[in-house]
């Protein structure tokens, strides 16, 4: 979600994520004529090894800003990817699906 919201000290990281969002939207318009869909996921904190290595204060700050007050499970992010890869999303392209528990709400 760093490409969708700003935060102190995240200029480089957020800019790189925003560039991926732009690339997703641009590629969707370029490849749509070939029936190729391009979408992206924007997950927030996800329970991974990286999550476990975060400073507790930083982790809690983000979790308190999240509507669901918890990190995503890896399977929850994977399920969003499976949806986008399936025929259930056949008319979705150029979108950024926020799997963020309400962080960017």
Tell me the role of every PLM-derived stretch:
Residues 13, 21, 91:
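Catalytic tyrosine of NAD(P)H-dependent dehydrogenase/reductases that use a Tyr as the general acid/base
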Residues 1-5, 103:
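Active-site segment of SDR-like NAD(P)-dependent oxidoreductases
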Residues 16, 24:
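Active-site helix of classical SDR
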Residues 29-33, 90:
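Alpha-helical segment proximal to the catalytic Tyr-Lys
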Residues 52-66:
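A short C-terminal helix-loop "cap" of Rossmann-like NAD(P)-dependent dehydrogenase/epimerase domains
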Residues 21, 38, 42-53:
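Short, flexible catalytic-loop segment of classical short-chain dehydrogenase/reductase
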Residues 4-10, 32:
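Active-site "substrate specificity/gating" loop of NAD(P)-dependent dehydrogenases
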Residues 40, 63-88, 92, 101:
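C-terminal helical subdomain
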């Amino acid at each position: 979600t760093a490409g969708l919201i700003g935060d102190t000290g995240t200029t480089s990281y957020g800019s790189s994520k925003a560039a991926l969002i732009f690339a997703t939207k641009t590629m969707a318009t370029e490849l749509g004529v070939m029936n190729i869909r391009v979408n992206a996921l924007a997950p927030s904190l996800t329970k991974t090894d990286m999550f476990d290595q975060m400073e507790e204060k930083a982790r809690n700050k983000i979790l308190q800003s999240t509507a669901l007050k918890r990190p995503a499970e890896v399977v929850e992010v994977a399920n969003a990817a499976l949806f986008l890869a399936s025929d259930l999303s056949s008319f979705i392209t150029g979108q950024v699906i926020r799997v963020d528990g309400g962080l960017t709400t």
